[in-house]
Structure formats: C-alpha cells, structure tokens
Design a protein with these regions (language model features):
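Conserved ABC ATPase "signature" region
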Residues: 120, 124-127, 132-152
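Conserved ABC transporter NBD signature motif
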Residues: 79-96
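Helical segment within the ABC ATPase nucleotide-binding domain
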Residues: 195-208
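Helix-to-loop junction immediately C-terminal to a conserved catalytic motif
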Residues: 74
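Conserved ABC ATPase signature
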Residues: 112, 156-160
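Catalytic Walker B motif of ABC-type/P-loop ATPase nucleotide-binding domains
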Residues: 181-185
C-alpha cells in the first residue's frame, strides 16, 4: 500500500500474504542497518525495534537520515545492508505492499483529479474487481472523513492548499487499514488545530484499530505525543526509549532538552575519541 508519486510505475495487485507473525513480535526489527550513498554513510549501524500497536516517533534535525530510514523500511531505498525485518518479512517483500501505508513529505496526489477520485483510483489498485466496489466506496469515505476533508471531497487536488494535499496523501495511506503506517513529516504545513486533530487520529488508529505508526518530525514538542521515540543525529541513533525514560535518564524536563543533552554527550564522546587516537 505504498504511496507512489504521479507518473511513477504502478504496482499490480499484491500477492495474498501468508500467515502473519506472532502478535508479540515487533512490527520492525533492525540490526546493523547501514545505508551508504556515494562517499557518505547516511545511516550508520542502526539497531532498534518498533513495537506493534504503538506510535513511535522518529525525531531529529533535517538531514539526519529520517527519510532515508523510512524509505529503507518500505523497501524503496537502495544500497541497504544489515538486517531489516518489517511485519515478519524482509523490508520490501512483495507481501508487504498492502500491509504498509506510506506518506512521503511531498504530496503524492493527482492535481487534475478530485479528492474522492484520487482515493477511488488508489483504492481500485489496492482492492481490484467489481465485487469489491462497495467495500472500496466505504473505505474511501472513511479515509476522507478521517482526515477531515469531507467538505472538499469533490474539489480538485490541484486547488487545495499544501496542508490539505498532505491530508489527501494521508487518506490514501489509510486505505485498506494497513498494519503499519510510515508517515514522513505528516503535520508539516498544518495549523495547530489540525495538528491536534491528526494526532488524535493517530492515537485512535493505534489504540482503536491496532495499527503501528512510525511518525517522523523535526518538531520536538510532537515527541510528547508518542509512546516511544527514536532520536537521530547525523545518521546515528542517539536513543530508543519512551519519553518518560528519556527525561529520567538525562534529568531533563522536556524531550527537547533531553535530546540536546544527548547531542552534547555524543559530541563530547566523539571529541574524546579523536584526542585519544
């Protein structure tokens, strides 16, 4: 259920997935995950797990490797080494197509189609056949309602604001009720009320529908809304813990302060290593 930008190749119907992994297994498991792009190591020896049915925040400054990590998870990133298992399969496995919803930073919608037509199109790819028409219609209507675009359902996507187009992309990702949602900066360009409403939706999807969410952001106050956090800097993982545990570990009052203290610790350790060589 990957989001594809207009003009990119379209996948055919995904094969029927086999029996899923046991419920207690993590949604994502990574060991020694590394991505090298030219002379630069973009992700360096990452190891982490993402628990099922929870919201995990992927936080760090722009350019730290968050989007690269998300592309690796959904199987679209080249030159990935190490272990990366997603929903019990290697990342990019064909059976994951309809089990993952992916929202990129750039809205993946067709400007010359209405909101509903965009969703109808993607729903037909995910759930083809005439006999599925009623199910698709209900799925599309629910997704439009989820992202609060009911009053804009018949508006051309090209006439929407940037924030509204982002919400159309999110609605596409929600089609088919995926087990894992990978959302790259989904609240960028949204006003505080819509940000709050989307985070309420994310929690409903996790707790009410049992899905797993990985949500990236460079806005540290969004960290407080997550069950668990992956904090990144310069392609490395600084922390993999709960917000409460991070504050306790660093003696900080906020996650942002905790992040800055971890950055200072990492910088100091790197300098010490350089001077002892």
């Amino acid at each position: 259920m990957m989001n594809n930008a207009p003009g990119s190749p379209r996948p055919g119907p995904a094969p029927t997935p086999g029996p899923g992994p046991e419920p207690h297994t993590p949604a994502v498991h990574a060991e020694h995950l590394t991505v090298v792009r030219g002379p630069r190591t973009v992700l360096r020896d990452l190891g982490f797990t993402i628990p099922r049915g929870r919201i995990t925040g992927l936080l760090g400054p722009s350019g730290c490797g968050k989007s690269t990590l998300m592309r690796a998870l959904v199987g679209t990133q080249a030159k990935v080494t190490g272990t990366l298992d997603v929903l019990g399969h290697p990342a990019g496995h064909p059976t994951l197509r309809t089990r993952i919803g992916y929202v990129t930073q750039a809205p993946s919608v067709y400007d010359d189609l209405t909101v509903r037509q965009n969703l109808d199109y993607f729903a037909a790819i995910l759930d083809p056949g005439r006999t599925a028409a009623g199910r698709r219609d209900a799925d599309v209507t629910r997704a439009i309602t989820d992202v609060d675009l009911t009053t804009h359902a018949d508006a051309l996507a090209g006439n929407l604001s940037g924030g509204q187009r982002n919400r159309v992309s999110l609605a596409v990702a929600l089609l088919g009720s995926p087990e894992l949602l990978v959302l790259d900066e989904p609240t960028v360009g949204l006003d505080p009320v819509l940000r709050r409403d989307l985070w309420n939706l994310f929690h409903d999807i996790a707790t009410g529908r049992g899905a797993t969410l990985l949500v990236s952001s460079h806005v540290m106050d969004e960290a407080e809304r997550c069950h668990r956090l992956l904090l990144m800097r310069d392609g490395e993982l600084l922390a993999d813990d709960t917000p409460d545990a991070l504050r306790t570990r660093t003696g900080a009052a906020t996650v942002e302060e905790a992040f800055l203290r971890l950055v200072d610790e990492a910088t100091s350790a790197a300098r010490t290593k350089e001077t002892t060589r």
